[in-house]
Amino acid sequence: MTAMRRGGALLMALWTIAVLSVMVLSFAYEAHQQSGINVYVRERNRVNRFTEAGQAIAEVILLNYSSVADWTEDQDTEKLLEDDRWICEKQSLKMYANCTVGPLVLDEEHPESGTVTVEIQTANAGSQGIININQLYSGGGDGKYMERWWMLFKAYNIPEELSTPTDGTINLWNILIASWDDWRDEDDTVTAIDGDETGAEAAWYEEYEEQEKIDEEDRRRPRNGPIPDVHELAYLRGWRDYPQVLCGGVINPWEKPEDQITVKKPGIEHLFTTVGTKKIDINNCHSLDALVTVPGVYENPEDNDALDEALGVAQAILDALKVKPDYAVDETRDWWPFKDWNDLTERVEEDVGSDAGQYFAYKPDDSTVFKVKITGESMGMTHEVNAECYVKNGKVRYIRWRED
């Protein structure tokens, strides 16, 4: 019995040791996990503080960029920097409609702690989010808004007429334009183009949603005003039926491969924004597809070669920005903005029609909406903020603020 008891005691001791070992390992694992969580939280808080600092820097630049002196060839930049840390960025924003700060080390004693980068440009610029769609309708004061749609559709290979298995041959362009008009305008009259009611008001959507048994939370009615988000286009008549218009891809997959039509990716949605004016920041526009929609860049949109000719003019505009003009400029740059319409027409080798003048902006003004991108980085972690804002009465007012 004594031996059996000793054996049982030994087994119990071994079992207890095993349990304790598991508990110790568990505690160690939890401590390690907690340590990892603490590091994550600490670094996340750090990059959050970096983006907050970036916001402060952006606002300092935005609030008085317009009051600084223009860059001159003989300016004493070092002396100016002694008086204003951000003078170069302010001059850049004033003269070139964009500026970049950083990557900037905020803690000089611990440079490895991370950086912040601030990028500012006008809203109607860049390679996407250029055309304010809220201005591109019958009530937007643009007598050539339909022509601009036609050129946009041509640029993305969106067919004017489309043979469908359910509705026969439809005029897709008219449906897209008219349904957007009805969604955007303030009346309840169905828009007709060439005598056909190709638009859609509330009654059309009600009938469609009942027929398709659309869930209540997904039902929509015309906004009868400006839209806040370009993704809203996906709810419109025609646009919802042919999402390839927005995102690219084969628009008629029911056809034989040789008869299929591919809308150029990524589709037209990425060109749109919902803020700003009808003017494009010509000095910072990097999209040929946006430029070909400008009257004066294109001539007659109904010509078969209208798109090719417009692309040639648009490319000539972008090329001219990279050629140093024959007046005093900052030669450290690799591109030089157009000062105004006269400067543009003198520097661009192709003929640009006079109509284009009313669609181009050259510098920010009181009506300008800005895009601000703030990126904080620390220990491999990144926090990005994308905002849209404007300056009014001495304050930066935010229209949209998105964080990753």
Label every model-predicted segment:
Residues 2, 8-18, 22-404:
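Compositionally biased linear targeting/interaction segments
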